[in-house]
Amino acid sequence: MSLRERCARLLEALGRRFGIEGLAFDERGLCALAFDRRMTVYLAADTRLGGMVLFATLGEFEPAERPDLLLAMLRGNFMWRVTEGATLAVDPEKDVALLVQCLSPQGLEADQLEARLEGFVNAALSWAERLQRPPAGAPERAGLAGMMLRV
């Protein structure tokens, strides 16, 4: 069985676990799953890497403006301790932060994929939230009142 076939069968079995009959890759080879309307995770069979790739966009990110966050992302990648085995990255063309993971489909069952996906989603949500926080020491926004001038 080819990698694409194995990944397609895994995805279909995952869909059954979620109560989604016929879950499959689209014509581009992607499957998008939305979680709590807060995070979309894409799955794809990648023959170049030999696995099923999970990826999620965490938000806009300009590394030069947030060196503190860039350092946190590098530290987060160390031994994958706080990324559930995934890797944090920055898309240089779009200035967005991503979480990416490649899973070997060999011996992977739908329940194991579900568990890995859950860990991935939790890590993605955590890092997306962290991306939205202002840098340490940044002045707090005061809303409209803070922007008003007294005349």
Model-derived features: positions:
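Charge-rich, low-complexity N-terminal segments
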Residues: 1-41
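Hydrophobic residues embedded in beta-strands of well-ordered beta-sheets
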Residues: 31, 50-52, 95-97
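Short, internal acidic amphipathic alpha-helical interface segments
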Residues: 57-102
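Structural motif
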Residues: 27, 46-48, 93
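A short acidic-to-branched-hydrophobic micro-motif
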Residues: 41-45, 50-60
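Short, highly charged C-terminal tails/helix-capping segments
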Residues: 131-151
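Ampiphathic alpha-helical segments that act as solvent-exposed interaction surfaces
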Residues: 72, 103-134
